[in-house]
Amino acid sequence: MSHFYDLAPKDKDGNPFPFSNLKGKVVLVVNTASKCGFTPQYKGLEALYQKYKDRGFIILGFPCNQFGNQEPGSDEEIAQFCQKNYGVTFPVLAKINVNGDNVDPVYQFLKSQKKQLGLERIKWNFEKFLVNRQGQVIERYSSISKPEHLENDIESVL
């Protein structure tokens, strides 16, 4: 894939979710898990989404079970967990791999655009990538970066 907008991962129902529909939006992409110490970040992510969604901001959650088997549920179970426990209204897409031989093209692209400490691989759940309105990956945040600490960067590209 040569461009962010060429990507089309699957949503939780198995339907394509074409990133071409995101043109002109600021996008925060996050690999998520329901049984992780960072899972409470869902609350902060939802707060960011509510604060900025009317200004062209969207968050995409990608569940992943590659770190400590902390996302064992089905796509439907994951979506229900997010809504019930954290009131998540931003899109939570189908479970994917973010590293390894079966890495999803979304993460293959994101990691190639922004390395973390010189490394491409995702180190843990809740790493975040900020994509500007032109589809360029402008920042990558580690798992320990709390959603509220991203506000200045989000504001700067809205």
UniProtKB/Swiss-Prot annotation:
Mitochondrion found in the keyword field: yes
SUPFAM superfamilies the UniProt entry points to: Thioredoxin-like
GO annotations of cellular component type: cytoplasm; cytosol; mitochondrion; nucleus
Induction annotation: By oxidative, osmo- and heat stress.
Residues passing through the membrane, by range: none
Compartment(s): Cytoplasm; Mitochondrion
EC number(s) per entry: 1.11.1.24
Keyword presence, Protein biosynthesis: no
GO biological process, one term: cellular response to oxidative stress
Major location (coarse): cytoplasm
Keywords for this protein: Antioxidant, Cytoplasm, Disulfide bond, Mitochondrion, Oxidoreductase, Peroxidase, Redox-active center, Stress response
Disulphide linkage map: 36-82
Reaction catalysis annotation: a hydroperoxide + [thioredoxin]-dithiol = an alcohol + [thioredoxin]-disulfide + H2O
Active site positions: 36
Main enzyme class: oxidoreductase
Single GO term (MF): thioredoxin peroxidase activity
Top-level taxon of the source organism: Eukaryota
Subunit structure, as described in the record: Monomer.
Family: Belongs to the glutathione peroxidase family.
PANTHER family linked: GLUTATHIONE PEROXIDASE
Further comment: The active site is a conserved redox-active cysteine residue, the peroxidatic cysteine (C(P)), which makes the nucleophilic attack on the peroxide substrate. The peroxide oxidizes the C(P)-SH to cysteine sulfenic acid (C(P)-SOH), which then reacts with another cysteine residue, the resolving cysteine (C(R)), to form a disulfide bridge. The disulfide is subsequently reduced by an appropriate electron donor to complete the catalytic cycle. In this atypical 2-Cys peroxiredoxin, C(R) is present in the same subunit to form an intramolecular disulfide.
Function, as annotated: Glutathione peroxidase-like protein that protects cells during oxidative stress. Has peroxidase activity reducing hydrogen peroxide, alkyl and phospholipid hydroperoxides using preferentially thioredoxin as a reducing power. May act as a scavenger of H(2)O(2).
Protein name: Glutathione peroxidase-like peroxiredoxin gpx1
Organism, as annotated: Schizosaccharomyces pombe (strain 972 / ATCC 24843) (Fission yeast)
